[in-house]
């Protein structure tokens, strides 16, 4: 915002709100003819803002894919419909990764824009690790398994808890920290209670300081059923944190030697054994391989910046 940007709040994107959301978008574009590019990041649901943008005559309309499947919830059929209609309202296709682009657009015309983060914000810091653990009442000797993400079907929290239960049997002095909220939160909390080890599972809700938790974790867990290129996986690698991903997470997320991909066909016990064998004895505060990564915002922003300049030139040429 320091560069002059503004934030506008649209109605929440719930099914009962779709007509209200679309009308709000129509009015917004009417009131703000100065905007010549609309860049939407809500996957199949991008159909709604881009349809309103097309109606308003906005020349550049970008849909940006961040996922490789659609949650099988009550909105599933509607999202599938919007996905099929999306190409009728967009002018350009962007994606965080190849698999995500293939899924949403079903062609090879999309532009790859890597998910990028401010790498320095996540570099490992022993003092932050100790501080976070102290505030949570976790000793320096305790093994901390961490997960950050929306509590929803795609993140596979039931299996995450099963893995932790098996791991806890191997390494009793361990805890699972779950950061995030979502539509399955109560169901997953109840499942954790039934596991018999819920005293060692902590639900921390949404946080605005997640960069500190990568320091406190010993491993990051993403046993997802589907993903785009997950930002949490990128952030964790900048913190030199060992990561365990399911095979459903695109391998393009990996840029450090501490990423591990395990099949969801393997049992929770097999996952637990793999995690128990990981070396957590040393983490670097800064590694040259990470500095050079495409996911570092200091280099990756140039890709998006150059693309925007290219699109503005298209507009000027008419």
Identify the meaning behind each predicted range.
Residues 8-9, 88-128, 301:
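Donor nucleotide-sugar binding/catalytic pocket of nucleotide-sugar-dependent glycosyltransferases
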Residues 14-20, 102-107, 116-135, 140-142, ...:
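Acidic anion/phosphate-binding donor-loop and adjacent secondary structure
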Residues 121, 282-318:
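A charged, aromatic-enriched C-terminal amphipathic alpha-helix characteristic of glycosyltransferases
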Residues 188-205:
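Nucleotide-activated donor-binding/catalytic signature segment of Leloir-type glycosyltransferases, i.e.
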Residues 206, 225:
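Aromatic "clamp/platform" in nucleotide-sugar-dependent glycosyltransferases that forms part
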């Amino acid at each position: 915002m320091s560069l002059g940007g503004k934030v506008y709040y649209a109605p929440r994107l719930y099914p009962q709100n779709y007509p209200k959301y679309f009308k709000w978008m129509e009015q917004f574009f009417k009131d703000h003819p100065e905007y010549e590019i609309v860049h939407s990041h809500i996957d199949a649901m991008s159909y709604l803002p881009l349809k309103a943008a097309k109606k308003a005559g906005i020349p550049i309309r970008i849909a940006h894919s961040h996922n490789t499947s659609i949650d099988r919830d009550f909105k599933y059929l509607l999202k599938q419909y919007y996905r099929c209609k999306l190409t009728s309202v967009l002018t350009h296709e962007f994606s965080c990764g190849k698999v995500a682009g293939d899924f949403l657009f079903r062609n090879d015309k999309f532009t790859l824009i890597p998910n990028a983060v401010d790498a320095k914000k996540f570099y490992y810091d022993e003092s932050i690790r100790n501080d976070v653990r102290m505030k949570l009442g976790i000793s320096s000797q305790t093994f901390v398994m961490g997960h950050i993400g929306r509590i929803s079907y795609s993140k596979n929290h039931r299996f995450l808890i099963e893995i932790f239960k098996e791991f806890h049997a191997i390494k009793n002095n361990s805890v699972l920290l779950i950061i995030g909220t979502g539509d399955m939160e109560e169901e997953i909390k109840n499942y954790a209670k039934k596991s018999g080890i819920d005293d060692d599972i902590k639900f921390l809700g949404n946080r605005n300081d997640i960069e500190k938790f990568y320091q406190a974790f010993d491993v990051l867990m993403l046993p997802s059923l589907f993903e785009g290129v997950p930002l949490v996986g990128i952030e964790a690698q900048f913190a030199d944190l060992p990561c365990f991903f399911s095979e459903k997470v695109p391998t393009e997320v990996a840029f450090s030697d501490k990423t591990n991909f395990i099949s969801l066909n393997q049992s929770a016990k097999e996952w637990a054994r793999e995690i128990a064998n990981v070396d957590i004895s040393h983490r670097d505060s800064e590694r040259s391989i990470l500095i050079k990564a495409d996911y570092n915002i200091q280099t990756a922003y140039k890709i998006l910046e150059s693309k925007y300049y290219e699109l503005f030139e298209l507009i000027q040429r008419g």
